[in-house]
Regions:
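Hydrophobic/small residue at the entry helix of a nucleotide-binding pocket
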Residues: 57-58
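Glycine-rich phosphate-binding loop and adjoining beta1-alpha1-beta2 segment
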Residues: 11-14, 75-113
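E1/E1-like adenylate-forming module used to activate ubiquitin-like modifiers
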Residues: 139-243, 278-290
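A structured beta-alpha segment of the ubiquitous adenosine-cofactor-binding alpha/beta core
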Residues: 98, 102-152
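Conserved S-adenosyl-L-methionine
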Residues: 67-72
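Conserved N-terminal Rossmann-fold NAD(P)-binding element of oxidoreductases
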Residues: 51-53, 76
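N-terminal charged helix/coil linker that caps or initiates catalytic domains
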Residues: 1-50, 270
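Mid-domain beta-loop-alpha active-site segment that forms a flexible
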Residues: 239-259
Length: 294
């Protein structure tokens, strides 16, 4: 029987003078008048953002959003920090080995300014918690573990039922690339993208299907045999430590563009399309179709 984890709730005291002083450097890029700048910043301030998975990308995004002026977060992650996380994850350290990732990230985020509201789901996203986590969110980021299927489907179903949540991002790093998968109420649902039953066991065939659908493009190096060894044999996703900060920047920028409605931002393709930035070849592109059907 699983131990029931207690949820931590942070409720900060809002100080208007402190808030506007701490986000002051944002404002010059947000409008042509002080009124326009503040109205756009207020959209970010008042948004409720859910981050499902607070590892290498999600944890860093949570802290960046607080610095940018977001005041309302919901964080979920069932995992505990281990030694291998120190290579890339915000909050991972020898001191925090064995501690819940969402709890550590929430603690760090709250300590930055103490004027924010954070709900922590240390049990992560489950069939039972998905709708409660989604409730009240304007945007949700799916940064859950690569091998999650059933609970990921539950989160996406909760999104499609939500009247408030506008869209979801799923942004994995693959080698030296960052992929941006966008889900809306009208996009292809993730169950159709994956084409895997929610109760499927993680067999080599299922793992290869996940690789195909989450990693649309791969470089020739390293070879497929080595990737199969990691993903299929060891059931572990390799992540190059320099890449999560790239994903963090892209993710936070896209969130800001959408939430603040910054003039000039383009709409990225929704699933089954995607956007990708590759730091190895220094290229970026938009893909508008189901890549696996080619």
């Amino acid at each position: 029987m699983l131990q029931k984890l207690e949820r931590t709730i942070y409720r900060g005291e809002y100080n208007s003078d402190l808030y506007w002083e701490r986000v002051d450097r944002n404002l010059g890029w947000l409008g042509n008048s002080e009124k326009e700048q503040k109205e756009r910043q207020e959209k970010l301030r008042d948004a409720v953002i859910g981050i499902a998975g607070t590892g290498g990308i999600g944890g860093a995004v949570a802290l960046r959003l607080i610095r940018m002026g977001v005041r309302n977060l919901k964080l979920a992650d069932p995992d505990q920090f281990d030694i291998t996380n120190i290579q890339r994850q915000m909050g991972a350290s020898l001191v925090n080995v064995g501690r819940n990732k969402a709890e550590v990230v929430a603690e760090m985020a709250y300590e930055l300014t103490k004027d924010v509201n954070i709900d922590v789901f240390p049990e992560g996203i489950t069939m039972e918690s998905a709708e409660e986590f989604m409730d009240g969110c304007d945007v949700v980021m799916d940064q859950m573990d690569f091998f999650q299927i059933r609970n990921r489907y539950a989160l996406h179903r909760a999104f499609r039922k939500s009247d408030r949540c506008r869209f979801m991002f799923k942004i994995p790093t693959v080698g030296h690339s960052v992929f941006v998968f966008t889900y809306t109420k009208d996009s292809m649902p993730i169950e159709e993208v994956y084409g895997i039953p929610e109760n499927a066991d993680i067999t080599p065939e299922v793992t290869r299907r996940l690789m195909e659908r989450i990693m649309p493009e791969l470089h020739e190096f390293p070879g497929q045999d080595m990737l199969d060894h990691w993903f299929v044999d060891m059931e572990r996703m390799p992540i190059f430590g320099a890449c999560p900060p790239l994903a963090e920047g892209i993710l936070v920028e896209r969130l800001a563009h959408e939430i603040m409605d910054i003039p000039g931002h383009i709409k990225l393709p929704v699933q089954p399309g995607y956007a990708v930035f590759d730091s190895l070849t220094w290229t970026a592109k938009l893909v508008e179709k189901a890549w696996w059907a080619e």
